[in-house]
């Protein structure tokens, strides 16, 4: 239903405009009702994440439902990289560059378009050194971590933070591999 309605807006619009963006935002924000957010919370509870991580994520969703969007965004944006590491079976220190590269590979392994990885690299974990670099509605981890806010974050930005986390949580994990002393890898036995 939502996809059909968005296509309707796209097909009846004369091109990219603020009006079209607002119409699409209204559809998406209307679709993600408090009930749908609670459904997301239930699916996260059923995930393979550690109980304390599930609790943190659940509290971020509750903050969103209460209209405390800054809390939701601040929490979730700092969790994304850890969630990605969980999917990649990374337990130690790992560079952001390698994480981004391996995340893009994981997205491909899940038969999804690489644009999701590019979105993550270019808008989510990229540097945000000034308030002017903030893109409204898109929660940038670096910007959030360093208080680069033009104004109080809105519901759209909070929902985007939730949907990014949900996207990561629902990816199939990377096939575990074993690295041999010669640097070669092969699939590990379960």
Question: Which residues are covered by each model-predicted region?
Answer:
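Glycine-rich, often proline-containing surface loops adjacent to acidic residues and nearby aromatics
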Residues: 37-43, 53-60, 140-147
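Amphipathic alpha-helical interface elements
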Residues: 43-107
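Short, mixed-charge amphipathic alpha-helical segments
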Residues: 44-49, 103-139
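Surface-exposed polar/charged interaction patches
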Residues: 12, 30, 34, 47, ...
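Internal, Lys/Arg-enriched amphipathic helical interaction segments that engage polyanionic partners
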Residues: 1-43
């Amino acid at each position: 239903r939502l996809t059909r309605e968005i296509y309707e807006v796209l097909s009846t619009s004369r091109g990219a405009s603020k009006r079209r963006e607002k119409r699409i935002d209204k559809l998406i924000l209307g679709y993600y009702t408090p009930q749908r957010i609670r459904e997301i919370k239930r699916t996260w509870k059923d995930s393979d994440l550690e109980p304390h991580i599930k609790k943190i994520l659940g509290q971020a969703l509750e903050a969103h439902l209460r209209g405390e969007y800054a809390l939701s965004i601040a929490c979730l944006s700092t969790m994304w990289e850890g969630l990605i590491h969980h999917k990649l079976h990374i337990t130690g220190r790992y560079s952001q560059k390698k994480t981004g590269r391996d995340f893009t590979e994981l997205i491909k392994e899940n038969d999804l378009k690489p644009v999701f990885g590019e979105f993550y690299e270019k808008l989510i974990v990229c540097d945000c050194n000034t308030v002017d670099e903030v893109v409204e509605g898109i929660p940038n981890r670096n910007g959030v971590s360093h208080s680069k806010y033009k104004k109080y974050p809105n519901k759209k930005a909070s929902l985007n933070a939730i949907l990014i986390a949900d996207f990561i949580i629902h990816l199939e994990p990377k096939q575990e591999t074993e690295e041999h002393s010669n640097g070669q890898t092969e699939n590990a036995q379960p």
